[in-house]
C-alpha cells in the first residue's frame, strides 16, 4: 500500500529537482519552469497530507496555489517576452551586463 511517506518522498524529490533547476540554470525561462516544478511538488505534499488526515484544507491550499501559479504564468511569460524582444536573450549574465 502506498502511504503518506511515499507521497512525501516523491514530493521532496520533485522539489529537490526544481530547487536544483533554480540554483543551476542561468536562463530566466528555465528558472520559471523550475519554480513551477517546485510549486507542483508542494501541491503533491498538500494533497497527500490532506488525504491522510481526512481534511480538505490541504486540497484547498493546493487549488489556491494552482490559481496563483496560473496568474504567475500569465504575468511571468509576458515579462519574459518583453525582455526577449528588448535584449534578444533571457540569460541572466547577459541581462545583468545590459543595464539601461
Curated annotation (Swiss-Prot):
The chain crosses the membrane at residues 2-22, 29-49, 63-83. GO terms for cellular component: NADH dehydrogenase complex; plasma membrane. It is a multi-pass membrane protein. It catalyses: a quinone + NADH + 5 H(+)(in) = a quinol + NAD(+) + 4 H(+)(out). GO terms for molecular function: NADH:ubiquinone reductase (non-electrogenic) activity; quinone binding. It is an enzyme of class 7 (translocase). Keywords: Cell inner membrane, Cell membrane, Membrane, NAD, Quinone, Translocase, Transmembrane, Transmembrane helix, Transport, Ubiquinone. GO terms for biological process: ATP synthesis coupled electron transport. Its EC number is 7.1.1.-. It is found in: Cell inner membrane. NDH-1 is composed of 14 different subunits. Subunits NuoA, H, J, K, L, M, N constitute the membrane sector of the complex. Belongs to the complex I subunit 4L family. NDH-1 shuttles electrons from NADH, via FMN and iron-sulfur (Fe-S) centers, to quinones in the respiratory chain. The immediate electron acceptor for the enzyme in this species is believed to be ubiquinone. Couples the redox reaction to proton translocation (for every two electrons transferred, four hydrogen ions are translocated across the cytoplasmic membrane), and thus conserves the redox energy in a proton gradient. This is NADH-quinone oxidoreductase subunit K. It comes from Sulfurovum sp. (strain NBC37-1). The gene is nuoK.
